[in-house]
């Protein structure tokens, strides 16, 4: 039941002093209680069940934070025969760049850098396309297979490369792209920028070893294959490859 206002509330020049009033000189400095903010940031046990069972889109299913990162910075000499590197090499440890246990999930891959030619090659009149394949190896063993062992090509041309039929159950091309450079005296484009960001959600499994090597993978290794289309003029790629991953709950 609502109380009526006291008569002195209606009298001019007078006011009732509230018991909850704060006359401290630091009153304006402290944080004020916001009812709406407290409701939004309420603890998980006071939320409905769907909030406890559903996970945000940032964290993959079966994983937990924080989001960790591993970088691979290297200059690559890319030839017509192709090159491969493993980008899921993560050492076991306690840091922000290490995995906690055997299992983790690579949420996304970020590739940035440039493709360029040296002083002798860029003077020749030619066009060279550098092609990249992000491949998932479902059953890694030993050392990474070479470009020619994994891909089937017509007339040894990397632009026609597809996974061999007997390896399609093991290797899966997740993404592919290319960058083009042109040499010559006039209409030359001696370097090309590379910038790609992919969401992959690849669950990697290691064995009991701590070292981050391809030979210690047991499931779902991430490989980056590179090859150029020109047979006699190689190119260089200065790349910084970053993977963002989460540790698995089952570790």
From Swiss-Prot:
Gene Ontology biological process terms from the UniProt entry: symbiont entry into host cell; viral penetration into host nucleus
An example Gene Ontology molecular-function term: structural molecule activity
Short sequence motif Nuclear export signal: positions: 96-117
Alphabetized InterPro entries for the sequence: Gem_coat_AR1, GV_A/BR1_coat, Viral_coat
Record-linked Pfam families: Gemini_coat
Gene Ontology cellular-component terms listed: host cell; host cell nucleus; T=1 icosahedral viral capsid
Domain of life: Viruses
Residue ranges annotated as motif Nuclear localization signal: 35-49
Localization: Virion; Host nucleus
Quaternary structure note: Homomultimer. Binds to single-stranded and double-stranded viral DNA. Interacts (via nuclear localization signals) with host importin alpha-1a.
Function: Encapsidates the viral DNA into characteristic twinned ('geminate') particles. Binds the genomic viral ssDNA and shuttles it into and out of the cell nucleus. The CP of bipartite geminiviruses is not required for cell-to-cell or systemic movement.
Family label: Belongs to the geminiviridae capsid protein family.
Protein name: Capsid protein
Species this chain originates from: Squash leaf curl virus
